[in-house]
Structure formats: structure tokens, C-alpha cells
A protein has these predicted regions:
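Structural alpha/beta surface segment adjacent to cysteine/selenocysteine redox centers
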Residues: 32-138
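C-terminal cap of thioredoxin/glutaredoxin-like
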Residues: 5-6, 11-21, 26-43, 47, ...
Length: 167
């Protein structure tokens, strides 16, 4: 009957795998939207989120001297004005979700090392925390998330063991 179904639901876990990249604004927006939906889900404690690593551009060369806006314009063959309009639209979408994006401050960074750190953080049950601080550091603070010192500081911020994080 119904009670058996309810009991089965309360004992089972729902695993949601999320494939995303730290340099993708829509991944950050999707994360926030998913979290808001999860807050309304009566069985949210039964949901296990597994962050998977996906690089949108594995060949991206880190360049802290160019903004993501400039890089996107160059890579797509768009004008800087058009790219800023696109970025402003995404920034407004983010603001609607309580996020602050600054594409002119965000730097072009290969996300491989950030993903390596995420996989390590997951082994210590800190994947969710690291995911959030990395996205915030990239989109809001304009941090170079391919820089070792930046990654170590973010790891320390959420309590990851320093020496292990450096490996």
C-alpha cells in the first residue's frame, strides 16, 4: 500500500549527477535554480548531488590579462558591444537569482585544476562547498581559478587540508 511506498521513498536515495564547468555562467545559474527547487522538495534529504567535471574548453589558455567578455568576443568573432549586451543579459538573469556576475572582472582561466580540486574536495564531503566558492570566486570576485595560490586559498576557506589540497 501507500505506507510501503512512503517507507521505501524515505529509505532510498535519489542521485542527481550534475556535469558542469566553473567557467559556464549557465551552470552557476542552473546550480542556483536546482537548489531553489530542491528546497521545495519534501524529500530533499533523500537527494544526493554528485558534481561531475566537464570542461567546456579544455584547450583554453589561462590569461588573466583579458576579461571573459573580450575573450568571448574574440573567440566568436563578435563585436565587443554585442558581447557586452549578451553578458549584460546573463548578468541580469543572474541578479534575478541573487547572483552577482562581473564578466569584465572575470578572467580567462582553464578550469582543469579547479576540477581536480573539486574531485579531491568530494572525497572529504566538501564538494558542494568548494563548487560554490569556486563559482563565486570566478564570476563575482574575478579570481583566476587556474592559479595555484587562489585555489589553495579557496581550499583553506572551506577547511580542506592544505598539504593534501596542494597535491
Amino acid at each position: 500500500g501507500c505506507n510501503q511506498t512512503e517507507k521505501a521513498m524515505s529509505n532510498s536515495k535519489i542521485t542527481v549527477e550534475v556535469w558542469s564547468d566553473f567557467m559556464c555562467p549557465f551552470c552557476y545559474l542552473g546550480k542556483r535554480n536546482f537548489e531553489k527547487a530542491l528546497e521545495r522538495f519534501p524529500e530533499q534529504s533523500a537527494v544526493n548531488i554528485v558534481w561531475k567535471s566537464f570542461q567546456l574548453n579544455p584547450n583554453m589558455v589561462t590569461n588573466p590579462n583579458i576579461s571573459t567578455t573580450e575573450n568571448l568576443a574574440k573567440s566568436k568573432g563578435w563585436t565587443l558591444e554585442y558581447t557586452r549586451q549578451m553578458s549584460n543579459h546573463v548578468t541580469q538573469m543572474a541578479a534575478g537569482e541573487g547572483l552577482l556576475f562581473d564578466f569584465d572582472k572575470a578572467v580567462v582561466a582553464n578550469s582543469f585544476n579547479a576540477h581536480r580540486l573539486l574531485q579531491f574536495a568530494k572525497t572529504l564531503g566538501k564538494g558542494d562547498e568548494l563548487k560554490e566558492v569556486l563559482l563565486y570566486a570566478y564570476f563575482t570576485d574575478g579570481k583566476n581559478t587556474d592559479d595555484d595560490e587562489t585555489l589553495f586559498a579557496l581550499a583553506a576557506k572551506i577547511g580542506l587540508p592544505e598539504q593534501e589540497a596542494k597535491n
